[in-house]
C-alpha cells in the first residue's frame, strides 16, 4: 500500500492574499483540489498564519470565504513561514499516517517554499500544485519581481529539493494524483 497523502492548504487568508497574483483563480483551483481530495477520502489540513497585524480571529486572519474547512479537518496555527516550526503539524500528519503532502496556498516565496523545504528535510514526499499557489510582486533594489514570476520560479526550482528517498512532484491542481 502506498503512503497516505494529505493536502496542506497554507495561508489562504484575506490578509495574506492582499496584492497577490491571480487570487481569484488560485482560490478557485484550491477549492477544486480540496473538493477532489475530500471525494477521494484524502485528508485536508488547513494552515493559518498569525502575527501582530493579523491576529487570530481578525478580519485579515480569516480564510477566504470560498474556502470552508469541514468539521474534523485539522487546523494548524503558525507564527512563522515554516508550518512545522512551533506547531503541531508533525503530530497531525503522523496521526493521519501522511508521508506525502500536496502543497497549495500562499505565499510562494515564503510559507510555501519554507514548508516545502522543511517537509522534504523531514522525509515527506511533496507535490506542489503548480497553479494553486500565489505570491505578491516585490522588489529588491532596482529589480522588480512580479508575483507571476515568483510562482513560475518556485515551479521551476522545486524539483531541486528531490532526494533519492523522497519524491518531489509538480502537478496542476486537477492533475494531482492521490
What are the roles of these predicted feature ranges?
Residues 21-24, 30:
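N-terminal beta1-alpha1-beta2 module of alpha/beta enzyme domains
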Residues 43:
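Conserved beta/loop motifs at nucleotide-recognition and modification sites
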Residues 13-19:
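Short acidic, Gly/Ser-rich segments with clustered Asp/Glu that frequently serve as metal-coordination loops
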Residues 20, 51:
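Second-shell loop/turn segments in exported
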Residues 2-6, 28, 32-40, 52-178:
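Active-site-adjacent betaalpha module
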Residues 8-12:
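N-terminal nucleotide-binding beta1-loop-alpha1 segment
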Amino acid at each position: 500500500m502506498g503512503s497516505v497523502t494529505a493536502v496542506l492548504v497554507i495561508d489562504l487568508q484575506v490578509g495574506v492574499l492582499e496584492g497577490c497574483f491571480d487570487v481569484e483563480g488560485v482560490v478557485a483551483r484550491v477549492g477544486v483540489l480540496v473538493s477532489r481530495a475530500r471525494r477521494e477520502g484524502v485528508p485536508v489540513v488547513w494552515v493559518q498564519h498569525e502575527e501582530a497585524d493579523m491576529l487570530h480571529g481578525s478580519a485579515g486572519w480569516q480564510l477566504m470565504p470560498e474556502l470552508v474547512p469541514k468539521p474534523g479537518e485539522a487546523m494548524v496555527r503558525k507564527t512563522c513561514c515554516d508550518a512545522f516550526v512551533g506547531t503541531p503539524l508533525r503530530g497531525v500528519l503522523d496521526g493521519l499516517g501522511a508521508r506525502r503532502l500536496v502543497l497549495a496556498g500562499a505565499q510562494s516565496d515564503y510559507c510555501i517554499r519554507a514548508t516545502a523545504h522543511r517537509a522534504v528535510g523531514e522525509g515527506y514526499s511533496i507535490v506542489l500544485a503548480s497553479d494553486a499557489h500565489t505570491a505578491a510582486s516585490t522588489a529588491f533594489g532596482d529589480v522588480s519581481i512580479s508575483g507571476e514570476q515568483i510562482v513560475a520560479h518556485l515551479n521551476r526550482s522545486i524539483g531541486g529539493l528531490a532526494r533519492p528517498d523522497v519524491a518531489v512532484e509538480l502537478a496542476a491542481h486537477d492533475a494531482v494524483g492521490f
